[in-house]
Regions:
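An ectodomain-focused feature that recognizes extracytoplasmic/extracellular
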Residues: 18-73
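Internal interaction segment
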Residues: 85-164
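Mid-length scaffold segments of soluble, non-membrane domains
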Residues: 67-88
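Extracellular/mature segments of secreted proteins
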Residues: 27-31, 78-80, 105, 161-163
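Bacterial Sec-dependent N-terminal signal peptides
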Residues: 1-23
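Residue-level signal for mature regions of secreted extracellular proteins and peptides
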Residues: 10-13, 62-64, 90, 147
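Short, surface-exposed loop motifs enriched in S/T, G, D/E and P with embedded aromatic residues
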Residues: 20-28, 33-34, 83-94, 137
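A structural detector for beta-sheet-dominated domains
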Residues: 23, 50-52, 59-63, 80-82, ...
Length: 164
């Protein structure tokens, strides 16, 4: 009887695991396994989240040509959560004017606090501040908020399997 209830209790977790569709590849230089969400569209940007044994990399690509597309190491990204709390991170990518913005987190067995916040709180808006202090804001609707939360949760949980 206890097993029956424990199986019933775990069914929602199993149904989420089926929704977690990640692309499995190998890093072109190190040949280490790598997971990716692929590019997912959000308003005027696309997002790809990649994980390997060392880090989790968020790559935002600004697709709207009229928005500021130049970023350097002083550029920032701000995640605004429900309740108006914010998390601000610096660009970890190279200087470019192609609309590419990277945010990198360490891939650890225990999820870092900043990354944990992205998993547990719904993100209502994302603001990217470019070289000349111009801001590109991406406002997420309820469905996009849940989709983003699921993507981040999926890549973080599956990324832990790559840690050696």
């Amino acid at each position: 009887m206890k097993r029956f209830f424990s199986v019933i209790f775990l069914l929602p977790l199993l149904s989420f695991a089926q929704d977690c569709k990640l692309k499995k590849t190998k890093d072109q230089f190190s040949q280490e396994p790598k997971l990716s969400t692929g590019f997912v569209p959000f308003s005027s940007t696309t997002l790809s989240i990649d994980a390997d044994g060392k880090e989790i990399d968020f790559l935002f690509t600004i697709t709207n040509k009229s928005d500021e597309r130049c970023f350097d190491d002083a550029s920032t990204i701000s995640f605004v959560f429900e309740g108006k709390q914010k998390s601000i991170f610096r660009n970890t990518g190279t200087m470019n004017c192609e609309g590419l913005f990277h945010v990198t987190f360490k891939n650890l067995q225990t999820t870092p606090g900043n990354l944990q916040r992205l998993i547990t709180k719904k993100i209502t808006a994302i603001s990217l501040t470019g070289n000349n202090k111009s801001v590109t804001t991406i406002t997420l609707g309820p469905q996009q908020q849940q989709e983003l939360m699921n993507l981040i949760t999926c890549i973080v949980n599956e990324g832990k399997t790559l840690i050696k």
